[in-house]
Structures are given as C-alpha cells and as structure tokens.
Amino acid sequence: MVTDIRITQDKNDLLSCLQLRRTVFIEEQNVPEYEEVDGDDPNCEHVLLTIDETPVGAARLKYYDNFIKVQRVCVLEGYRGQGIGSNIINFIINYVKENGIRQSVRLGSQTHALEFYKRLGFIEFGDEYLDAGILHKDMAYQIK
C-alpha cells in the first residue's frame, strides 16, 4: 500500500479534492452545495492524500495575514480511523513550519472532532457557532 500526500499540483488533483469534499460534505453530511462550493478554491492551496493512487482525503488552506486556516478537511468514510486525518493535519503543520509561511494554523472544527484536533496540539478558542447547520468551534495551533 503506497500512501502519498501532497499540495495539489494540477487540475486533476484539485478535481479529486473537490470530489472528495462533495462525497463527504454534500452527500454524507447534507451540507448545501451553495455553502460547500464557496468560490474560494482558486485562491487557496489544496492538500490531497492518496492510497495506491486512489484519492481518500483532502483539505484546503486559506492564507490570512498572520495565520493559515485549514478548511474542508475530509476523509472518505471507508478510510476513517486509520490515521489519515492525522496524516493530513501533520503534513500541513510541517509544511507551514518548513516554509515559514505563518505563525499559527487555525481551523473551525466540527464539535464532534474537537478531541481529534486536541490530540494533534490544537487549542480551542471562542464560542461555538453554526456553519452549514453544523456546530463548530475555532481552534489554533501555534508554530514553535
């Protein structure tokens, strides 16, 4: 089994990320398409994780002045619980560290995933809020 994780390099990689998001968010979690497809994708970097060349996980990186925001983290249902989400987040943290991109990594976690992100070193801040009808809470990871 060959696992590859990368910043998307071409249109096919991006299309794979968008299809993963459609499957997880629109089809599985019933997020309205108009909320999932928000027009920010051309202005973001995207992370794709494949196993034996099959796309199974993705995330989107949006840049702000002093932080990078991780968005749209998703793993196909049949691949969850195998460390793929952790691999994606750790890849992003290392990418940010190695490239000196920003001082912190932030994200809006669905509340059911808070413990997952805490185990990876993220800290909660702010109040819970609804995004696409799903409870979320902001979290941050300080780059050391």
Where is each model-derived feature located?
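Short acidic/glycine-enriched loop/turn segments that link adjacent beta-strands
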Residues: 41-43, 66, 131-135
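Conserved GNAT acetyl-CoA-binding A-motif
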Residues: 96-109
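Short amphipathic alpha-helix that is part of the acyltransferase structural core
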Residues: 1-36, 41-46, 50-52
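Conserved beta-strand in the GNAT
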Residues: 48, 54-62, 67-74
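Conserved acetyl-CoA-binding loop of GNAT-fold acetyltransferases
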Residues: 118-128
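Conserved acetyl-CoA-binding loop-helix of GNAT-fold acetyltransferases
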Residues: 81-94
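C-terminal "cap" of GNAT-fold acetyltransferases
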Residues: 110, 130-144
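Acidic/histidine-enriched, beta-strand-rich ligand/metal-binding domains
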Residues: 78-80, 112-119
